[in-house]
A protein has these predicted regions:
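Generic signature of intrinsically disordered, low-complexity segments enriched in small/polar residues
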Residues: 26-28, 33, 47, 55, ...
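Metal-dependent nuclease catalytic cores that hydrolyze phosphodiester bonds in DNA/RNA
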Residues: 1-110, 210, 219-222
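Structural motif
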Residues: 10-20, 123, 185-192
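Generic detector of isolated residues embedded in canonical secondary-structure elements
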Residues: 25, 86, 130, 193-196, ...
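Metal-dependent nuclease catalytic regions and adjoining charged, substrate-binding loops involved
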Residues: 136-222
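Mg2+/Mn2+-dependent nuclease catalytic core
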Residues: 65-175
Length: 222
């Protein structure tokens, strides 16, 4: 972990937290977004964007012993991360972090909103963990858990922010920075979810796989 941390500190680039989710979902998609500026919308991404926008209807909601902060800017100088949190749930605790906009001490729990129904996706957990890492640096605290909230069925999943998950965040950061610094384009790898991707036509995973197969055949013949 220390070796990975040192690699990150030696680099000047900052990356968006959401790119970690892209990277672990599909490395090809992540490299297309970074290197060719491709980030098109389709019916699936547009629906998710509309639902996401409803999350940010207000900046704060404060109750007696708890509060919610929406659309909070996040950063980590140590890990070269920037981004926004959909929602931070704040629970009053004298041992927690002082939050100036709430004028009190709170424990913080990041909540990432996702389109669709409840499902256990690793890339979502990694994105959530990266948000927690930023909050820990910003407020000098330790966060042990966060939540994934699924909009369509109004359910949420508790995520324990384990050492294993944190290691995956660090590995993802280093690999994304390599894509940027080395112009590293990942090859396509077709899977069932590919046709729903907004970059499906640009990526052309089936065509690339066929071309690669033909090339290998010719190399064997020659």
């Amino acid at each position: 972990m220390i070796e990975v941390f040192d690699k990150i500190r030696d680099l000047d680039e900052f990356i968006q937290i959401s790119l970690l989710s892209e990277f672990y979902y599909c490395k090809r998609r992540c490299s297309l977004i970074l290197l060719e500026g491709n980030n098109s919308d389709n019916v699936y991404t547009m629906e998710g964007t509309i639902q996401h926008s409803k999350v940010h209807s207000s900046q704060t909601e404060k109750r007696l012993d708890s509060a919610k902060i929406f659309n909070l800017e996040l950063f980590s100088n140590n890990y070269s991360l920037i981004g926004k949190a959909d929602c931070i749930e704040c629970v009053k605790d004298k041992r927690g972090a002082y939050i100036d906009i709430l004028d009190g001490y709170y424990n913080l729990y990041p909540v990432e909103y996702k389109h669709g129904k409840l499902r256990d996706e690793e890339e979502y957990k990694i994105q959530l963990c990266a948000q927690a890492i930023c909050l820990e640096e910003m407020y000098n605290i330790t966060i042990e858990k966060g939540y994934l909230y699924f909009i369509n069925d109004n359910k949420r999943l508790e995520v324990r922010l384990s050492d294993e998950l944190r290691q995956k965040v660090l590995f993802g950061i280093v690999e994304i920075l390599k894509i940027i610094s080395e112009s590293k384009m990942y090859p396509p790898k077709y899977k069932k979810s590919c046709p729903k991707c907004s970059l499906y036509e640009k990526c052309a995973p089936k065509n690339e796989n066929i071309n690669g197969y033909i090339k290998n055949m010719w190399e064997e013949i020659l």
